[in-house]
Swiss-Prot record:
UniProt pathway annotation: Glycan biosynthesis; glycogen biosynthesis
Species this protein is from: Rhodococcus jostii (strain RHA1)
Family matches, as NCBIfam families: branching_enzym, PRK05402.1, PRK12313.1
Keywords from the UniProt entry: Carbohydrate metabolism, Glycogen biosynthesis, Glycogen metabolism, Glycosyltransferase, Transferase
Family annotation (Gene3D superfamilies): Glycosidases (3.20.20.80), Golgi alpha-mannosidase II (2.60.40.1180), Immunoglobulins (2.60.40.10)
Keyword Glycosyltransferase included in the entry's annotation: yes
Gene: glgB
Protein name: 1,4-alpha-glucan branching enzyme GlgB
Amino acid sequence: MTVEPPVAIAPDAADLDLLSRGEHHNPHSILGAHPHPDGTVIRALRPHAEAVDAVIGGTSFSLEHLAHGVWGALVPYRDLMDYRLSTTWPGGHNDVSADGYRFLPTLGELDLHLFGEGRHERLWEILGAHRRRYDTPDGTVTGTSFAVWAPNARGVSVIGDFDGWSGRNYPMRVLGSTGVWELFVPGIEAGDLYKFRVHGPDGSVRDKADPMAFATEVPPATASRVSVSTYEWNDAEWLAQRAATEPAQSPMSVYEVHLASWRPGLNYREMAEQLAVHLTETGFTHVELLPVAEHPFGGSWGYQVTSYYAPTSRFGSPDDFRWFVDHLHAAGIGVIVDWVPAHFPKDEWALARFDGTPLYEHSDPQRGEQLDWGTYVFDFGRREVRNFLVANALYWLDEFHVDGLRVDAVASMLYLDYSRPEGGWTPNIHGGRENLEAVAFLQETNATVHKQHRGVVTIAEESTAWPGVTRATNVGGLGFNMKWNMGWMHDTLGFMAHDPVHRSYHHHEITFSLMYAWSENYLLPISHDEVVHGKGTLWTRMPGDDYAKAAGVRALLAYMWSHPGKQLLFMGQEFGQTAEWSEERGLDWYQLDDPYTGGFHRGLLRLVHDLNATYREHPALWTLDTSPGGFSWIDANDTANNVLSFLRYGTDGSILACLFNFSGSPHANYRVGLPERGEWREILNTDAEIYAGSGWGNLGAVTATSQPWHGRPASAEVALPANGAIWMSLER
């Protein structure tokens, strides 16, 4: 039966007006259930409804339309425990739901305090969209809670496909002075799309994607998606082994991949299966992914992120990406992701001017804009922004089990005058150019990551001589495990581009990196940046015909793998792709089957496999990467023959001799000094016939006698192939 209530209680007209405009800071003070001397006042916001009833214990009480879509009634229950709202819509459709405005806040005081202090290390558990279940007297209620930080907003509402994107149905409340807006909405399920309608202090109204969204629509669509993980991990053994490993003293050979163009058309799971096979066949220990966080513009390669907490939906769901990582772990392959905390794009629907003011970006244009890229720079000194980023680093490690973060564009963060004209930057409090807030942020990120995740590696793309990038934070360093050695990359590629007859005049270019090889813990990169924008590829940088180019690439890679430091190679370079990389098409795998040059490409691919296998087998190539004691020159100055040679030492006492002939002529009886006499086995020869070389070599080994040479007590005559490399191991 239906009982007509004796009176309808209308709220203050000013409150109704604010509510109708989506600008009320506490809609829960109007909507929901409120005590009254004669019972309980129930109010509901149903702007398009034809009728609304409150259903209490099987009895329906009609609500009166008060104004602006607000319905209300006084019901004769002083201690109302529960009720439902029955809504009749145009066309006669009726639904019954719980009232989201009668639920307590989903964030506790401690959570809000920690966020306000910038110290909530699991921020993703309190902000964003979270599915919830409540057991109430009238039955179970399920739905989604939403929480977003927008301290300067005049009002925030949840909008989505569940309300026709109207923005009138679900205004949120602000929790105290934190600037966090919150609301629980019954009935919203995993997969539903949503945004926040944010009313700025300037009168602007913008529909914003959730900064903490765990999933998104497929670009170019921009909505956030409610997401719940049901994935069950299978990599406990991998994680335990990782925690017991010291990255600097372990083998690390990284294959850099842009997912969309490695083999186009694959999803996360298909890519994981095919990548695992390729990486196992080539022997890489890790894969590094260009940014996988959601980004609207594919041409940015992922470096203009709009949803920092969501793997791109181009290839599947967040659980599909979890499967991707899990599958590679099962194959014995670590996963590193590129992370972009330096800047973010100006898309109006994303982080930019989120609450109508500079919020995530610095308010000073001289610190808040990256002029080269047309992007905004994070305000690293703001506690909540710093918390957003530090928690994001932890999120990828906790939620997706990734094994490392390669931090992009670190130099742009460290210097206030980075790429700025004279007079276009503001000094720090000491009058210097260092961005002290960014330094503190990087230190906090690295210290927190390493405290919580032993064995995880953080890598800096830092292109200047900033001191202490890989020094521990407790002694003033930035705290990274490794830094890209951009100087090595520049000098080595420049040297190899010279014709062999001219290389002797540029010998210093190939040896200079050993002057500073232990100033930081380095990773040697031949990355995506070196095979685009007219730079060519490894193959096309080499002088000569295809035979000479193949030999040059093989020699370069052997030098790279034996040089102190870990190594990274961008996809396609492992088989010598001749065309520059483009994100718009896949790799030229067909070159492996080319009837004329395919042998060279297959030979290079085989060499990369053998480089990685030999590298892993010989601790001399990786256990002392960060110590000068792991390296010793035999001869760095043989410019006449265009030869350089050095020794690598392992913590197990093993010794390798690495010899490189960068001239265009072989040396038949090249005498090289060695630390001990005896048999030195040839463990790698880049000119071997299996690599499409000439087969010039040493028949498997040379014997060192007691004849001193190069300041060493022993020596041997070695056959050095033209444009080639030889590695030898002392047999004891």
